[in-house]
Amino acid sequence: MKLFEIENAVDCRIIGRVNRFVVDVEVDGRRERAYINNTGRLKELIFEGNVGKCLTKRGGKLSYRLFAVSCEGGYALIDTQLQMRAFEVAIPKISWLDGEVRRNVKVGNSIIDYRIGESYVELKSAALKKGIYAMYPDCPTARGRKHLRLLEEIGKRSRALVVFVAALPSVRAFMPNREGDEELYRLIKRSKNVEFRSIQVEYLNGKVFLRNPDLKVVI
């Protein structure tokens, strides 16, 4: 199912990651710096010589925003803002979610991504691919641990979910990555009050598609 189109994408070649938010790319023979909206390490995707897709960025010091990179004959949609947009557009097709959608919901001193009906939902980017599995995280994440502990408390009185967005081609299931964060892996395994769900989306030929609204989750 097509979710939306991404117009005016620019081809690029990756030179290397500069820091958490910046990657050097080559566009039309020119060396440029592009913003990257994903705090994962993405070492399997962001490496010299790999090709990607950028959008022209308005404002700020950087001219481009890297949103997708080549992955096993297709593209990984790495931009978390676009992943969130894909999730929101896909909600009517997701049978296990229903109700009014509210974004950035305050719970105590923290913010949860969504409240959908009576469900509290936190989105996570599963951008690591190992075989048939999309995985999260690819590096230690204190933020991820904090969110899961919060959802565990919320889940005692309401429905609480973590939804992993597998924005990768040719995956058949999601699995938490023990090597990325051992403590988070243990928290997921021990969780009693949180549902773990996953959807698969894919960027192809200028469009973002919903490939699976209920991707298998292996805990």
From Swiss-Prot:
It comes from the Archaea. One of its GO terms (molecular function) is DNA binding. InterPro entries: SfsA (IPR005224), SfsA_C (IPR040452), SfsA_N (IPR041465). Belongs to the SfsA family. This is Sugar fermentation stimulation protein homolog. It comes from Archaeoglobus fulgidus (strain ATCC 49558 / DSM 4304 / JCM 9628 / NBRC 100126 / VC-16).
